Amino acid sequence: MKTQIVILIVAVLVLQLVSQSDAFLQGIIDTVGKWLGKRGLKNLDQYNDLFDGEISDADIKFLQDLMR
C-alpha cells in the first residue's frame, strides 16, 4: 500500500512538472528577451533570405524543360 501511494505521488509530481514546464520556459524566454531588448530577438530565422518568393519566366522555362 505504501508503494502505491509513493508511485501515485511521484506520478502526480511528474505530471505537474510536465504541464507547468511550458509556462516556466516561456517565462525564462520572455525574461531573456527583455534583457536583450527588442532588437536582440528579431529576425532569428537565418533562412528567410534563402527563399525567393518570385519565380521568373526563365525559372518556369527551366522547370518545364526539366519535366520533359
UniProtKB/Swiss-Prot annotation:
Q: Where primarily located? A: secreted
Propeptide stretches in the record: 37-68
Give GO terms for biological process.
Answer: defense response to bacterium; defense response to fungus; killing of cells of another organism
* Keyword list, A-Z: Amidation, Antibiotic, Antimicrobial, Cleavage on pair of basic residues, Cytolysis, Fungicide, Membrane, Secreted, Signal, Target cell membrane, Target membrane
Known outcome of mutating I29W: In VpCT3W: Slight decrease in antimicrobial activity against bacteria and yeasts. Increase in cytolytic activity
Secretion signal, residue range per the UniProt entry: 1-23
Protein's cellular compartments: Secreted; Target cell membrane
Assigned GO CC terms: extracellular region; membrane; other organism cell membrane
| Leucine amide modifications at | L36
Distribution of this protein across tissues and organs: Expressed by the venom gland.
Origin superkingdom: Eukaryota
Please give the start and end residues of each transmembrane region: none
Q: Which family does it belong to?
A: Belongs to the non-disulfide-bridged peptide (NDBP) superfamily. Short antimicrobial peptide (group 4) family.
Tell me the function of this protein.
Antimicrobial peptide with weak activity against all bacteria tested (MIC>100 uM) and all yeasts tested (MIC>200 uM). Also provokes weak hemolysis on human erythrocytes (HC(50)=83.7 uM).
Q: Quote the protein name from its UniProt record.
A: Antimicrobial peptide VpCT3
**What species does this protein belong to?**
Mesomexovis punctatus (Scorpion)
